[in-house]
Amino acid sequence: MSEQIVTPESSTPVVLNNETKINLLDLNRQQMREFFKNLGEKPFRADQVMKWMYHYCCDNFDEMTDINKVLRGKLKEVAEIRAPEVVEEQRSSDGTIKWAIAVGDQRVETVYIPEDDRATLCVSSQVGCALECKFCSTAQQGFNRNLRVSEIIGQVWRAAKIVGAAKVTGQRPITNVVMMGMGEPLLNLTNVVPAMEIMLDDFGFGLSKRRVTLSTSGVVPALDKLGDMIDVALAISLHAPNDTIRDEIVPINKKYNIETFLGAVRRYLEKSNANQGRVTIEYVMLDHVNDGTEHAHQLAELLKETPCKINLIPWNPFPGAPYGRSSNSRIDRFSKVLMSYGFTTIVRKTRGDDIDAACGQLAGDVIDRTKRTLRKRMQGEVIDIKAI
């Protein structure tokens, strides 16, 4: 007899039969409980299975020893736990690891960044990106599609499984996740939010909401919607002290200018506990483009009403880019100006640049299926959030 379940991507029920299996990595806990209810099982069974999936990175129902054999057999008929596979691994001299992960016939990239007191995983949300930020390698690849929930949380699952199996090498377990990989997360809310819910869920990866960070270039209506959906730490890709410069290097600014963007940020902070009252400002340092002391004074004036800390990011080069990295002396002068205004200012340490895993260098393998007119539409207006 066929069963029906609602998938995260659609409100249309999918008929389960011998040819169709639900990937349980696509379901958050609420959806998992509904799925088990449709199987005639009690909701706590969903919690048990989620614990196996995420606490132990188990993808084999037969290994779930506290699940009865009848249910295990039923699950094998209608469901699967299928994370995307790693097809290439590169290791940096500084300990950073970059994985190329297959999503269908393409690849996205995921980066593991170990530090003394933490290990951060940088996760992708889309195959490519449509926003065309001029200093970012991903943006030069074009845009293909949004990642599914299973392809987003599957990056965390796969990395946790690899790191967990390598504990003897001293690799630190994942403590933080940043949605700063390939893509604009707010153009994929339908899948990004359930994936982050699994990251936060005690039966998922159980991360603190202060340890899950979403970074956005400024899709303002989607940012307003995010605040009603989930509470996570927020970082914003600002990169300029005025609209003239930002219009050039971050084209979405032509639709949602800095004032509009920062207004949405402040509205988000009013709803959020994860941010402890302030947002992280990301500012890539481009030589003689946005890195002068006059730009630092402008930035300080711009941000005086926005509680924040500022991350200055030395630009990481990629082939064909028209920019240069700011010198250490220019970055130092810029930082000192900001600190003189009382801003907490950090110069981000470049990690993984020898394997093209540093900020702005992720490229993956993207078949660009977004015509330029559609890219301009994505930059200039918000796509129906229900459709992304």
Swiss-Prot record:
GO terms for molecular function: 4 iron, 4 sulfur cluster binding; metal ion binding; rRNA (adenine(2503)-C2-)-methyltransferase activity; rRNA binding; tRNA (adenine(37)-C2)-methyltransferase activity; tRNA binding. The active site is at residues 109, 359. Its EC number is 2.1.1.192. It is found in: Cytoplasm. It comes from the Bacteria. It catalyses: adenosine(2503) in 23S rRNA + 2 reduced [2Fe-2S]-[ferredoxin] + 2 S-adenosyl-L-methionine = 2-methyladenosine(2503) in 23S rRNA + 5'-deoxyadenosine + L-methionine + 2 oxidized [2Fe-2S]-[ferredoxin] + S-adenosyl-L-homocysteine; adenosine(37) in tRNA + 2 reduced [2Fe-2S]-[ferredoxin] + 2 S-adenosyl-L-methionine = 2-methyladenosine(37) in tRNA + 5'-deoxyadenosine + L-methionine + 2 oxidized [2Fe-2S]-[ferredoxin] + S-adenosyl-L-homocysteine. Its main location: cytoplasm. Binds 1 [4Fe-4S] cluster. The cluster is coordinated with 3 cysteines and an exchangeable S-adenosyl-L-methionine. Signal peptide: none annotated. CDD domains: Radical_SAM. GO terms for cellular component: cytoplasm. The keyword Glycoprotein does not apply. Its cofactor is [4Fe-4S] cluster. Gene3D superfamilies: 1.10.150.530, Aldolase class I (3.20.20.70). Disulfide bonds join 122-359. Reaction proceeds by a ping-pong mechanism involving intermediate methylation of a conserved cysteine residue. PANTHER family: 23S RRNA METHYLTRANSFERASE, RADICAL SAM CORE DOMAIN-CONTAINING PROTEIN. This is Dual-specificity RNA methyltransferase RlmN.
